[in-house]
Design a protein with these regions (language model features):
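Active-site microenvironment for binding and transforming phosphate-containing groups
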Residues: 1-163
Length: 163
């Protein structure tokens, strides 16, 4: 699946990536963000994971009742597809605030391989290469920020709900 503009430029691209578990999973990417040379990014779908039942397949939430082991394996597969490690992920603690946290290498792994020492964070920013900023969306609009001057990136959710 690729979404295109009138002039046939690809706006959103589906890329199938090896996940390190012997299979593939689809990642959705914005070519314009990739072209900055500053950020590698993706959106996930529900395809390519191990969760069962109502959480089938690539559930990435530890807070919805899925088994932690399944969610961890799903993140391991996502990290494999992104050619990184889960210890590089940094998670928000989304509660619909306007709080944004600047994250550093000290924050790597918080929310997945070690405890978060912060709460009520709906946005993340960094200028440190190698960190994976992780935010979660259901009916909010995801926001990506790229600052080419300071070589910084950010992610947040909008406080405007789609539904």
């Amino acid at each position: 699946m690729n979404l295109k503009k009138k002039n046939n430029d690809i706006v959103l691209e589906e890329v199938w990536c090896e996940n390190g578990a012997g299979s593939t999973l689809p990642l959705l990417k914005y070519p314009l963000l990739e072209q900055t040379g500053i950020v590698e990014h993706c959106f996930t779908t529900r395809i390519g994971g191990v969760s069962k039942g109502i959480y089938e397949s690539l559930n990435l939430s530890f807070t919805r009742g899925d088994e932690d082991a399944a969610v961890r394996e799903n993140f391991r597969r996502l990290a494999g597809a992104m050619e990184t490690d889960v210890s590089k992920f940094v998670f928000t603690d989304q509660t619909h605030t306007t709080n944004v946290r600047r994250v550093t290498a000290e924050d790597a792994g918080k929310g997945i391989v070690k405890e978060r020492d912060y709460t009520d964070i709906d946005g993340l920013i960094t200028n440190e290469p190698g960190l994976v900023l992780s935010t979660f969306y259901a009916d909010c609009v995801p926001l990506y920020f790229v600052d080419p001057v300071h070589r910084a990136i950010g992610m947040s959710l909008s406080l405007i709900h789609i539904s």
